[in-house]
Amino acid sequence: MTVTVSQVLRPRGPQIERLTENRAKVVLEPLGRGYAHTLGNALRRVLLSSIPGFAITEVEIDGVLHEYTTVEGLQEDVLEVLLNLKDVAIRIHSGDTATLSLFKQGAGVVTAADIKTDHNVEIINDGHVICHLTKDTTINMRLKIERGFGYQPAVVRRRPDDENRTIGRLILDASFSPVRRVAYVVEAARVEQRTDLDKLIIDIETNGTIDAEEALRTAADILTDQLSVFGDFTHRDRGTVKPASSGVDPVLLRPIDDLELTVRSANCLKAESIYYIGDLIQKTEVELLKTPNLGKKSLTEIKEVLGQRGLGLGVKLENWPPPGVSQYGMLG
């Protein structure tokens, strides 16, 4: 007997209960036995690792050369100040990076509200304490904010040229994920006479830069996109992408601009005559790292963007470039 997709029990729309401003409980039922654990575990992993967010990644403080410095008039040591900066919840409305400043004079509490922002940057927890000034002194710092995924320790984000970086520029471990906590439980569910069903209850808490419902929806979209590649088994040879009978896969003919890479990464690729996605996926990691000004951070970005589309590096393409595609990045 063959079981079709339509015969698998489909749950009703999720029930969402907002517990606090940044926390919500989502209930999904009824689910077939075992499906609640399958979906709950997958969603939890994606929520904690793959939801994009913003974090302070670099700091410069006047008079501070390294993180183990103590500053006269500052109650905390610099290391504690940096730890407090990591918990500032920031959202950039347009773009991936921003540079902000903080200036405070006189004894008192320094909070996230003292960070100078513009219309494009929003600080959610402006009451968050950064440090305390114990006398009539000043603190002046510059903060770099970047967009990213998950958790990235400072050692991973250091570039080869960082040995020549500005003295006093402190690189922080960055937690980009806006999701602070995810927990799920599975309970029994019943539909009429059926009692062998599951109920999935997910408890999500964010830092306020994104609401829990939107975070869950984004996680579901990511899982859907990743699983969609199993709907097409035409490319069974993992080492070679073969053109369809009608020609080359149209995705490979799209310009690399469609990948929405950072300007730095895109310019580095174009400088090496990499104009199409088909050009890019044929390169290996080693080849890309030899590209001038393209470091490990850019390579990680490229791999993540390709992975979201079911693509990867080091792929061999037959008969590339196809007729009509020039080496100068123009169709014709």
UniProtKB/Swiss-Prot annotation:
EC number of this enzyme: 2.7.7.6
The protein's role, per its UniProt record: DNA-dependent RNA polymerase catalyzes the transcription of DNA into RNA using the four ribonucleoside triphosphates as substrates.
Organism: Xylella fastidiosa (strain Temecula1 / ATCC 700964)
Subunit description: Homodimer. The RNAP catalytic core consists of 2 alpha, 1 beta, 1 beta' and 1 omega subunit. When a sigma factor is associated with the core the holoenzyme is formed, which can initiate transcription.
GO CC annotations on file: cytoplasm; DNA-directed RNA polymerase complex
InterPro entries given in the database record: DNA-dir_RNA_pol_insert (IPR011262), DNA-dir_RNA_pol_RpoA/D/Rpb3 (IPR011263), DNA-dir_RpoA (IPR011773), RBP11-like (IPR036603), RNAP_asu_C (IPR011260), RNApol_insert_sf (IPR036643)
GO molecular function: DNA binding; DNA-directed RNA polymerase activity; protein dimerization activity
Keywords annotated in UniProt: DNA-directed RNA polymerase, Nucleotidyltransferase, Transcription, Transferase
Name the record gives this protein: DNA-directed RNA polymerase subunit alpha
GO biological process: DNA-templated transcription
Similarity-based family: Belongs to the RNA polymerase alpha chain family.
